[in-house]
């Protein structure tokens, strides 16, 4: 049994994440998805709660045919012990998938196998781009799995993002 670990903020989970996880699913038996910065929500850069992100990811991943875990991981702001923190919050895993330089460095320093998955259309499959499209009324739905769009609709996520992005003129 081989488990892989993949972490992201998933604000929101998008097709770039999904394509990476499809690739990972061909290499491991089980996938652990870590939801980073799990304690932050209702901001322009992190509009969705950990629970909302779990629902998005769960709906999108059901079709992969692999066992997966979705684990919220709050920030601890102590890089020297972060890998130990992650390991204490997740089932054991053998390989880490990431392109984030800090994540790669920390897991490599801890002696873990780290793989850098290909990135897919990063110029459009980007949480920053998708959130901007939501705020501006652009076509963001084509950039996320259908299950994610459904969750965002159910929680009125676009309305929330537009409201919190307004300037305070008081």
UniProtKB/Swiss-Prot annotation:
Transferase found in the keyword field: yes
Compartments, as annotated in UniProt: Cytoplasm
Pfam family name, one: CTP_transf_like
Keywords: ATP-binding, Cytoplasm, NAD, Nucleotide-binding, Nucleotidyltransferase, Pyridine nucleotide biosynthesis, Transferase
Highest taxon listed in the record's lineage: Archaea
Catalysed reaction, written as an equation: beta-nicotinamide D-ribonucleotide + ATP + H(+) = diphosphate + NAD(+)
Protein name (Swiss-Prot/TrEMBL): Nicotinamide-nucleotide adenylyltransferase
